[in-house]
Regions:
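N-terminal glycine-rich beta->alpha transition that marks the start or flank
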Residues: 11-13, 20-70
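Short, surface-exposed secondary-structure boundary micro-motifs
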Residues: 35-36, 76-78, 94, 152, ...
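A glycine-/small-residue-rich N-terminal strand-loop-strand element
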Residues: 70-94
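Mid-domain Rossmann-like dinucleotide-binding core that forms the NAD(H)/NADP(H) cofactor-binding site
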Residues: 84, 88, 122-198
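A structural motif shared across PLP-dependent enzymes of the aminotransferase-like
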Residues: 93-106
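Short amphipathic alpha-helix with an adjacent loop that forms part of the alpha/beta core around
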Residues: 200-210
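Glycine-rich phosphate-binding loop and adjacent beta-alpha segment
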Residues: 223-294, 327-330
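C-terminal capping/lid region of NAD(P)-dependent oxidoreductase domains
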Residues: 292-301, 309-330
């Protein structure tokens, strides 16, 4: 089968089309014939070596890239009872989705409802589940809360804005252009700050009457994290869940104290999908919201599998206005 793999860490040029044997599902696994693979910043971090020392997301070389996919069940390993060959499924947080086939633990597969297109289901896995755990668990938003969402026109950002509004929160969003601001606004953001024209921290304080927000969801990282911390209300929470501008290497404890005894966390999605019940519950919420026309899923571009290097370059240039997918050939 064809895969996109790396033999060494580095830039997008390290992504190569390779031939690998088709995997055989072990006991408790299902073989998935992939039609789509999601493209995410976690793929960039793994490709570049940022996660080389991670225990949660291990990166042995050589390595087939990709942590999210959608397709149909092609075969079942021993002991798998809840799936059948031909089921449409999607999944995330299993390495190796930039491929024609993947062997996936059966409990990590989500059966896709008939009314949900497979590209949408794939797009809702890593990014949708991220938006869900951020808004429902890391800081459980509700009426009366105000949140700041960075990169609100991106794949996670658009979903996070919508879920926050569904939970009754007020959303302040940041965007890098008028076009992206319009996207964030269309998804329900109450206020949008053009961060290239305005200091977002000053704007947040103006909007909130000097109080700050309850929670900041920051996927930008290095360029924004200090101002994100200082955009919080007293005892607020800064959630750093990505590093589009570079990974955050450290945060000084005194900085948190001086910002108003605020809190800081850097969560992993895997820790919020630790059981089948948690995974299936979050996915069911997302599919239900999509089916009720309460959650719009924007797919920005679909690249052929062989164009994975171009797809990574596009993602890293921070040009995205929604989800990026790879189309996997037959």
């Amino acid at each position: 089968m064809k895969v996109i793999a790396i033999a060494q860490f580095g830039g997008p040029e390290q992504l190569k089309v390779m031939d690998m044997p088709e995997p055989k599902p072990a006991a408790g696994e299902a073989l998935v014939k992939l039609e789509y693979a999601g493209i995410n910043f976690i793929d960039v971090y793994m490709r570049s070596g940022h996660y080389a020392r991670s225990h949660t997301y291990q990166t042995p070389l050589p390595m087939t890239i990709g942590m999210e996919g959608g397709g149909t069940v092609a075969a079942l390993g021993d002991g798998v009872r809840d799936l059948k060959v031909g089921d449409r499924v999607a999944y995330c947080i299993v390495r190796g989705s930039y491929a024609q086939y993947a062997a996936v633990p059966a409990w990590k597969l989500v059966r896709v409802p008939d009314n949900v297109p497979l590209p949408v289901a794939t797009a809702l896995m890593l990014q949708g589940l991220t938006a869900h755990y951020l808004s429902h668990s890391v800081f459980a938003l509700g009426p009366g809360h105000t949140c700041l969402v960075h990169a609100a026109a991106g794949g996670v950002g658009q979903l996070l804005v919508q879920l926050a509004r569904l939970r009754g929160a007020t959303v302040i969003a940041t965007a890098g252009s008028a076009e992206k601001a319009a996207i964030a606004k269309s998804r329900g953001a109450d206020q949008v700050i053009l961060y290239r024209e305005t200091d977002f921290r000053e704007a947040v304080m103006t909007i909130t009457g000097g109080k700050g927000v309850d929670v900041v969801y920051d996927a930008v990282g290095k360029d924004t994290i200090s101002r994100s911390i200082r955009s919080l209300r007293r005892r607020g929470l800064c959630v750093n869940y990505g590093g589009a501008s570079g990974l955050v290497q450290s945060v000084e404890p005194l900085e948190l104290a001086e910002a108003g005894s605020v809190y800081f966390t850097r969560p992993h999605l895997a820790d919020y999908l630790a059981t089948a019940e948690e995974l299936q519950g979050r996915a069911a919420d997302l599919f239900a919201a999509y089916s009720a026309d309460q959650l719009a899923v924007a797919i920005d571009r679909e690249f052929p599998l062989a164009e994975a290097p171009a797809a990574h370059a596009y993602l890293e240039a921070r040009n995205t206005k929604g989800k990026l997918l790879l189309e996997v050939p037959e």
